[in-house]
Amino acid sequence: MYNGNPLPKSLKGVLLLGFLFLYIPIVSLIIYSFNASKLVTVWGGFSTRWYVSLVQNEQIISAVTLSIKIALSTAVAAVVLGTIAGFVLARFGRFRGSTLFAGMMTAPMVMPEVITGLSMLLLFISMQQFFGQPSERGFFTIWVGHTTLCMAYVAVVVRSRLIEIDKSLEEAAMDLGARPLKIFFLITLPLVSQAIASGFLLSITLSLDDLVTASFLSGPGSTTLPMVIFSKVRLGLNPEINALAAITVLLVGIFVLIANYLMLSAQRTRMKAVAAAMREPAKPGDAGGAVATAS
């Protein structure tokens, strides 16, 4: 267990090597995205030609647009379904079929994506034969596949947070006559908001990064960004990919900084509210106000 003492120099050296191993390739990739040469490993001078070429590449722009739409739609659906599933797993305890339900929720996390993608492809083909829907594979089929995967991660994150929360606040609200739905939205949901935000960001990341499932569930005209990158890299290293990766790193970095800032600001606000509530003297018979303040 860490006791607050300074880290040994040897451990600092190992950490430094680990960070260098992780981030030197990213830095070199960003540097070579400004390379004027078509050979990505030979420096030919500073140029932004590949960024201009990237903006003019309709295939990549279309893939980026589709991937962002799928990622945002997946994150919204996964957060809603995963939060409900996590609440059921954490609050409903043992019920008939609870073990099966928990296993089905966590199965997409441990099942190989090849199996998931192939099974869903066969499902959609069978549905098309019997019901005529979906008429084609594209946005909808990829969205369903990504939601199935991401909701499992959201459910696990939300369930872990709910287990840590003291149930006394919810029980006190119930004693004061609050309905279960009101308790969920006014007490439980704010307490798990950080877990929900983490699940939302994780779902976006998983969706944007997915290649295997999208390869099975996509059709003509519905190529996602990872599929475009993979197809171009198979034919050889392309300087446009370096430019695309550099833009992605920049956008992800900005997005993460903003998300962390908002989450830290919300945490500071809650801590100040709790500190103010603890300093304020309690009034006799004001149990309802105490519960409302704590929530």
Can you annotate each of these PLM segments?
Residues P8-L16, L20, A85-M120, E170:
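Cytoplasmic-entry segments and transmembrane alpha-helices of multi-pass inner-membrane transporters
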Residues T65, K69-L81, A85, F185, ...:
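Hydrophobic alpha-helical transmembrane segments of multipass integral membrane proteins
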Residues M1-L7, S73-M105, I125, L257-L264:
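Transmembrane-helix boundary motif in ABC transporter permease subunits
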Residues I24-V27, I31, V80-I84, L118, ...:
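Membrane-embedded alpha-helices of multi-pass transport/permease systems
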Residues L39-G44, T48, V114-L149, L181, ...:
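Membrane-interfacial helix termini and adjacent extracytoplasmic/periplasmic loops
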Residues Y2-G13, R94-G97, R159-M174, P180, ...:
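C-terminal transmembrane helix and the adjacent membrane-cytosol boundary/short C-terminal tail
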Residues Y2-P8, K38, Y51-I60, L208-Y261, ...:
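Interhelical loop and adjacent transmembrane-helix boundary motif
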Residues V14, F19-I26, A155-R159, I165-D166, ...:
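Transmembrane alpha-helices
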